[in-house]
Regions:
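Glycine-rich beta->alpha junctions and the first turn(s) of the following alpha-helix
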Residues: 192-292
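Well-ordered mid-protein domain cores that form the structural environment of catalytic cofactors
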Residues: 91-128
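Internal helix-loop-helix
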Residues: 44-106
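Generic structural signal for well-ordered, non-transmembrane alpha-helical segments
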Residues: 244-247, 286-293, 325, 329-336, ...
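DPxDG-like acidic metal-binding loop motif
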Residues: 135-183, 198
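Glycine-rich phosphate/cofactor-binding loops in nucleotide/flavin-utilizing enzymes
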Residues: 348-395
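N-terminal glycine-rich anion-binding loops that anchor highly charged ligand groups
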Residues: 33-49
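C-terminal helix-coil-helix/basic helical segment that borders enzyme active sites and/or dimer interfaces
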Residues: 22, 26-29, 293-329, 340-346, ...
Length: 395
């Protein structure tokens, strides 16, 4: 089912990557990173720089289109969609940096960021910048990234490395961009799913970072266009991942149901009777379609409502903030329900490596562990709805 938001030409171009992705799927699983042809195709598509502003020759796609592109790529392969999501989210960093630094990092057409914002490093203030050290986790897309994010607690070496506090008494956090040659990659990505993302750890040791190559991730962006008025909008590409994975699972079961004997449901096989003829299979597919349709509608409507506020330069009210974050979690949980239920129906089609149902199941189980979409995020959303402070700066 298509929406008015997934008719952008880039969505069709993403769909056309299917043969390239299929050809490289086994290699991506084995090598645990995207293949060079897939990376090149995604660069040509602009999938890694969806939020780069037009002034830097970027596409500056509206958030609904970002979701739609990631959804389609995730339908083709969860790892491909995940890498697009991470890089697209990273491209919002262009809104934090001063113009010259933004052009230096985000002007090249092959720009691709990896990493995340958890402050696991240490930054010491020096003249003109910071000295950064630390180990950083989950560098999704690190195998083809042109820059990696290093987020750090700012510490004071003069006081035994005590955290520096901001004017509100909170620990000061500084994020910075590092070149791949400034870090050491650590082979840690041996996981349940999303094998091809190459989400390895990386380390930096006493790297000097200029002020202009760093930013306060809790602060406001420098750019003032609608796409950069609400910093948590950088999460929006994430919403497309579960929708695409769930779509792939439904399509996979439908494809196998005509050729798979009904004994898969535990009964005795009947002559000439396929899985598609069993009521349990029919019910499961119908429920999955309804659940996915509802989750998609809620996702796109929530993002569109938020976008209307930003385009009108209006403040995002608390309820809208709560629903935006809850939407992220909801989409992932619904997709997990779909993939688990269809894996049960698919039986042995869900346990062998290379089977589409198995791939969807392991990918969504892994995706749902991300801290930005975990069910615990319902709590701060609920706090807002009940008139309390969220207790979470990202909500």
């Amino acid at each position: 089912m298509r929406t008015r938001y997934d008719t952008h030409p880039l969505v069709d171009q993403a769909r056309a990557l299917g043969p390239i992705v299929e050809q490289g799927r086994d290699e991506m699983d084995q090598q645990r990173h995207l293949t060079s042809p897939v990376v090149a195709a995604m660069q040509d598509l602009g999938a890694f720089r969806m939020a780069v502003p037009a002034q830097l020759d970027g596409p500056a796609l509206d958030p609904m289109t970002q979701v739609a592109v990631v959804e389609e790529l995730s339908r083709l392969d969860g790892s491909v969609g995940w890498c697009a999501m991470i890089a697209a989210a990273g491209s919002y960093v262009s809104g934090f940096l001063a113009p010259d630094a933004a052009r230096r990092w985000f002007g090249p057409a092959d720009v691709c960021l990896a990493g995340q914002l958890a402050p696991t490093g240490r930054a010491v203030r020096v003249d003109g910048g910071y000295r950064i050290s630390g180990r950083f986790r989950f560098g999704s897309g690190s195998g083809h990234a042109t820059a990696l994010i290093a987020s750090c607690l700012v510490v004071d070496d003069r006081h035994d490395g005590a955290p520096v506090r901001d004017e509100r008494g909170r620990p000061e956090i500084r994020s910075a961009l590092l070149r791949p040659d400034q870090v050491t990659m650590i082979d840690t990505w041996h996981t349940t799913g999303l094998w091809g993302t190459g989400s390895n750890d990386y380390e930096a040791h006493d790297i000097l970072i200029a002020d202009e190559d760093s930013w306060n991730p809790a602060g406001a962006m420098r750019r003032t266009e609608p796409l950069y008025r609400y910093p948590p909008l950088f999460l929006v590409p994430h919403a497309g991942v579960p929708l695409g994975i769930a779509r792939a699972a439904i399509d996979a079961l439908i494809e196998v149901a005509d050729s798979k004997a009904s004994a898969a449901l535990g009964g005795r096989a009947k002559e000439g009777r396929a899985l598609a003829d069993e009521a349990q299979c029919q019910e499961a597919v119908a429920i999955a379609e309804v659940k996915l349709g509802a989750a998609r509608a809620y996702t796109y409507d929530t993002v569109a409502e938020l976008w209307e506020l930003l385009e009108a330069d209006e403040r995002v009210p608390p309820k809208q903030r709560a629903m935006y974050r809850a939407m992220m979690t909801y989409g992932h949980q619904v997709a997990k329900e779909i993939c688990v239920s269809l894996a049960d129906i698919g039986s042995t089609s869900s346990i062998f490596h290379g089977e589409p149902l198995q791939r969807s199941l392991r990918d969504i189980l892994t995706a749902c562990q991300h801290r930005m979409v975990h069910p615990k995020l319902y709590v701060p959303a609920g706090r807002i709805l009940l008139g309390r402070d969220s207790g979470d700066p990202m909500v």
